[in-house]
Amino acid sequence: CENRIKSLLVDSYQVTKHYLQSLSKLVTVIYIDDLNRFLYPVHTLICYGDYWRKFHYKEKYSNTNLFLGSKYIPLRQAFKNQEKKKIKPQVENLLFLSGGTDHFHLLEGFLEKLEKEKYQKIQVICGRYYDEYEKLRSQYVDFDHIHFHKGVRHMENYMMEADLAVSAGGTTLYE
């Protein structure tokens, strides 16, 4: 069948060895890893973290295509052609990024402890699955220099404007 899936890219922490084994019997599986939780039964393994050497992939995977290192970071096109960021001597603009959900309410904790008056602008970007967005935003309605956003497009604009960013893990750190 010409519409049959030939390859599948998997990027999830929820996978199990059994799941990947089952998929690998049906299609060519490409797995993005950064935890090295177990030996992944896949055709191709990508680890774009600079720490890939500590996982000893080359010794463990003799029959798997390996793509290791930061040259394989899946950056969005907008980040590939950015001009170099000019670093200011003083931090005036802050950027907080929670990732998708912020289960541990880190944004709330950061904002609570932060000396908010020290900064000209504070951008707070919540992931689209962050349930406490309206509650958090309403707590800072009296602060004109604190701006809240949810599920933004063009993240690169916020990053270029920021003098300092605090981020959840993931690809955002490379961006």
Write out the residue ranges for each language-model feature.
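Short alpha-helical segment that forms part of, or immediately flanks, the ligand-binding pocket
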Residues: 156, 174-175
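A nucleotide-sugar donor-handling region in carbohydrate enzymes
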Residues: 42-103
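Generic hydrophobic/aromatic pocket-lining and core-packing "Φ" positions
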Residues: 20, 107, 111, 173-174
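Acidic donor-binding loop of glycosyltransferase active sites
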Residues: 160-171
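Active-site and donor-binding regions of nucleotide-sugar-utilizing enzymes
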Residues: 1-61, 66
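Short beta-strand/turn micro-motifs composed of small residues
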Residues: 33, 47, 98, 126-128, ...
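Hydrophobic/aromatic beta-strand patches that form the interior of the parallel beta-sheet core
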Residues: 9, 30, 44-46, 123, ...
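Donor-nucleotide binding loops and adjacent catalytic segments primarily
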Residues: 89-162
